[in-house]
From Swiss-Prot:
Originating organism: Burkholderia pseudomallei (strain K96243)
Function: Part of the ABC transporter complex UgpBAEC involved in sn-glycerol-3-phosphate (G3P) import. Responsible for energy coupling to the transport system.
CDD domains registered for this protein in UniProt: ABC_MalK_N
Subcellular location: Cell inner membrane
Major subcellular location class: membrane
Protein known as: sn-glycerol-3-phosphate import ATP-binding protein UgpC
GO cellular component: ATP-binding cassette (ABC) transporter complex, substrate-binding subunit-containing
Oligomer status and interactors: The complex is composed of two ATP-binding proteins (UgpC), two transmembrane proteins (UgpA and UgpE) and a solute-binding protein (UgpB).
Entry keyword set: ATP-binding, Cell inner membrane, Cell membrane, Membrane, Nucleotide-binding, Sugar transport, Translocase, Transport
PROSITE patterns: ABC_TRANSPORTER_1, ABC_TRANSPORTER_2, UGPC
Length: 360
């Protein structure tokens, strides 16, 4: 195991426009960090640079205190798990798991011992004699993880390993990866576009956007205090409601652009840097708008209601803004119904419309 450090890491191709812009992060020994963002944000490029599959244009990558910019992937003491399992079809599970050690000249007895140990961790013991075609998608991904485990690397790198699995298997594999990290405590960097994977797996999340690290922090902090409108809209399902408008001179109301006046008394508290009488983007998550006794409320004309099982989502519009409200299972408003919604001051977020950055 080892700490991983990225200092001012930038990437461009042929001296053209940069695709990664000055990434700075220190990942502690044994920490599980998730890079999350939409397609094209630079997360996989950054992972490939850590692995040595892409060169570093500027900056420094260090593993265990050793700068690895000039080292080949095989010399970085890392193991990688890919989206595509990359298993040899003619080899058994045991042979696939041990092949990387075999080509490195590791003794057969040690290979067998490590394969057996990894198989026990991943519950692959009964499958060791099978070939990939005889395995399910989840089993194949566990074999790919086992191949990484037997290396006993300093750092695990996961490149969207669950993308090829169906929804049920993704949930199962998320739990298995959690248990694996709890058992091995190996430094891990995990790439995904799925914010649910990021929130459930990570000790810290790095939210990527257009080559920048928009926010780095614990999942709960990123969710509760998004640094930008991008983070607010990307993290959370459904996304945070973002409303353009103007805060009244007394700070007691927010006038949604082409929409209603909303009561927000107490939201622009002292020291939060939220100036009244100016334009803001107001953010509030759907679950914080559930009607509560005694809360200041507005009304929303319901366009549709999604029945999700444990809870429901009511949808409507304030001006040009789509608004979603999470409701308990028993509340199922119909189209055209007027729904009272809460706007608790403690759960309101204000963002600068010019920069998209959070205030306060």
């Amino acid at each position: 195991m080892a700490a991983l450090s990225l200092k001012g890491v930038r990437k461009s191709y042929g001296g053209a426009q940069y695709v990664l812009h000055g990434i700075d992060v220190d990942i502690a020994d044994g920490e599980f960090v998730v890079l999350v963002g939409p397609s094209g944000c630079g997360k996989s490029t950054l992972l490939r640079m850590i692995a040595g599959l892409e060169t570093v244009t500027e900056g420094e990558i260090a593993i265990g205190g050793r700068v690895v910019n000039a080292l080949e992937p095989k010399d970085r003491d890392i193991a990688m798990v890919f989206q595509n399992y990359a298993l040899y079809p003619h080899m058994t599970v045991a042979q696939n798991m041990g092949y990387g050690l075999k080509i490195r000249g590791v003794e057969r007895a040690l290979i067998d011992a490590r394969v057996q140990a990894a198989a026990q961790i991943l519950e692959l013991g009964p499958l060791l004699a099978r070939r990939p075609r005889e395995l399910s998608g989840g089993q194949r991904q566990r074999v790919a993880m086992g191949r990484a485990i037997v290396r006993e690397p300093s750092v695990f790198l996961f490149d969207e390993p669950l993308s090829n699995l169906d929804a049920k298997l993704r949930v199962q594999m998320r739990l298995e990866i959690q248990r694996l990290h709890a058992r091995l405590a190996t430094t891990s960097v995990y790439v995904t576009h799925d914010q649910i994977e990021a929130m459930t797996l990570a000790q810290r999340v790095i939210v990527m956007n257009r080559g920048y690290a928009e926010q780095i922090g614990a999942p709960v902090d990123v969710y509760e205090k998004p640094a930008t409108t991008f983070v607010a809209s990307f993290i959370g399902s459904p996304a945070m409601n973002l409303l353009h408008g103007r805060l009244s001179e007394d700070g007691a109301a927010f006038d949604v652009a082409d929409g209603p006046r909303l009561p927000v008394a107490g939201a622009a508290g002292a020291g939060r840097g939220i100036a009244p009488g100016r334009e803001w983007i107001l953010g509030v998550r759907p679950e914080h708008m559930t009607p509560q006794p005694g809360e200041a409320f507005a009304t929303l004309a319901v366009d549709s209601c999604e029945l999700l099982g444990a809870d429901n989502l009511a949808h409507g519009r304030w001006g040009a803004h789509d608004v979603a409200v999470r409701l308990p299972h028993a509340m199922r408003p119909t189209r055209g119904e007027t729904l009272p919604v809460a706007l608790p001051a403690r759960h309101l977020h204000f963002f600068d419309p010019a920069t998209g950055k959070r205030a306060g």
